[in-house]
């Protein structure tokens, strides 16, 4: 049964909200860097990863890949009117500092930088050391 060609549903475009203060969550692991920009309540405004930015394999875990990922997340966040950022960094990866520098050079006012890396009180056994 084919739909009637003449009828169209009235679809209203979702209005973009304006968020001035936001939080940038940078998860820098040894293999990848994930940058997520959220509003104050934690609702995601934009995100980008080093792997999703076109880097594959060992190039994903470089500071340059983290810089590109932070720039891409920042571009989308600018559309929401974001001006001020609080940065939360998690993980020991190589993209920690370069992601912050990229967000700063993208034109955001960075209010605070917080390291929220989870530190175990002798929890899980770590992976065995590499023998190359």
Curated annotation (Swiss-Prot):
Part of the 30S ribosomal subunit. Interacts with proteins S7 and S18. Binds to IF-3. GO terms for cellular component: ribonucleoprotein complex; ribosome. This is Small ribosomal subunit protein uS11. Belongs to the universal ribosomal protein uS11 family. Located on the platform of the 30S subunit, it bridges several disparate RNA helices of the 16S rRNA. Forms part of the Shine-Dalgarno cleft in the 70S ribosome. GO terms for biological process: translation. InterPro entries: Ribosomal_uS11 (IPR001971), Ribosomal_uS11_bac-type (IPR019981), Ribosomal_uS11_CS (IPR018102), Ribosomal_uS11_sf (IPR036967). GO terms for molecular function: rRNA binding; structural constituent of ribosome. The keyword Ribonucleoprotein applies. Keywords: Ribonucleoprotein, Ribosomal protein, RNA-binding, rRNA-binding. PANTHER family: 40S RIBOSOMAL PROTEIN S14/30S RIBOSOMAL PROTEIN S11.
């Amino acid at each position: 049964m084919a739909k009637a060609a003449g009828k169209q549903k009235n679809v209203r475009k979702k209005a973009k909200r304006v968020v001035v203060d936001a939080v940038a969550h940078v998860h820098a692991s040894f293999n990848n860097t994930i940058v997520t920009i959220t509003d104050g309540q934690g609702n995601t405004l934009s995100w980008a990863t080093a792997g999703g930015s076109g880097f594959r394999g060992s190039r994903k875990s470089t500071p340059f890949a983290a810089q590109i990922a932070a720039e891409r997340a920042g571009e989308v966040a600018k559309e929401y009117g974001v001006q001020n950022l609080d940065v939360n960094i998690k993980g020991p990866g190589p993209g920690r500092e370069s992601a912050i520098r990229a967000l700063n050079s993208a034109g955001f006012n960075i209010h605070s930088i917080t390291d929220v890396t989870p530190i175990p009180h002798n929890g899980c056994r770590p992976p065995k050391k590499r023998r190359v």
